Amino acid sequence: MKKNPLSWLALYITSIFLVFSCKNEGEVYINKNLNADYVDFWLSDESESKIFSKQTTGVDTGRVTVGTFENIIIDTNQVYQEMDGFGFALNGGSAMHLFNMDQSSRSALLNELFGNNENSIKASYLRVSIGASDLDEYPFSYNDLPDGETDIGMDNFDLGYDKLYLIPILKQIIEISPDIKIMGSPWSPPAWMKTNKNTIGGSLLPEYYDAYALYFVKYIESMKNEGIIISAITIQNEPLHDGNNPSMHMTSLEQASFISQSLGPAFLQNQIDAKIIIYDLNADNIEYPISV
């Protein structure tokens, strides 16, 4: 019988919390602290007749032996980076649709996604855009100015449009899950900072490195004033893909220069402890983050 990879993946991910085999094959360890005889799992199949559907029968952990399924080997002596959480992106367009739902439906959905109930997904991490993403109603930054004007002191900085939908939804999510971690990612700086003065493409002009670093500081501080803690930021969404609106091209050298010359010092000066994540794109170009 052909195994459906999506179906088995759902099983493996759930099973890993209860059962694992060590490198000495033949030994199976059960996490007895959970006192669970069965592992629940959710199923998705290629036909989409089932999409993340919880199954009525689970896996009997008492009868699992090595070789029953493909083995998941965990070497507790080999440790890599810590996981901050699991979740998804919440863009402005999604926030707008959530905001426009009736209150009871929105509450039910947010509790299903972020709550701590038995049937909740319990997402623990969110990624939001700093300014507009390409899935917002229209492109914007937090310091848009008429052509020819600049504001290196960020006197005109304002969360603006995000106060309509995104921030109210984030506040509701935080009420449900106070410990949720939120990462901010910019699709583009204000157009006046860029080589082409456009929301699409272009590059960040070096003379505005300090201004853009202050832009990040103002963002984190302004969100904190709204009761929203930004635990991490990325420097640029998809830095090598500059065709969306908004977007910007940013090489690894440019990213390294911006962080070392301006963003890092600005974070230190303003006691910002948010993580800085490098290369906000697919894991297909490991040389980019390594070089930064």
Language-model segments: residues:
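N-terminal zymogen propeptides
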Residues: 30-62
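Bacterial N-terminal signal peptides
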Residues: 10-19
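N-terminal catalytic cores of secreted or lumenal carbohydrate-active enzymes
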Residues: 52-230, 251-253, 261
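Bacterial N-terminal signal peptides that target proteins for export
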Residues: 2-10
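Bacterial Sec-dependent N-terminal signal peptides
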Residues: 18-35
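Conserved beta-strand positions
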Residues: 128, 184, 235-238, 278-281
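Active-site neighborhood of glycoside hydrolase catalytic domains
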Residues: 211-218, 222-229, 239-292
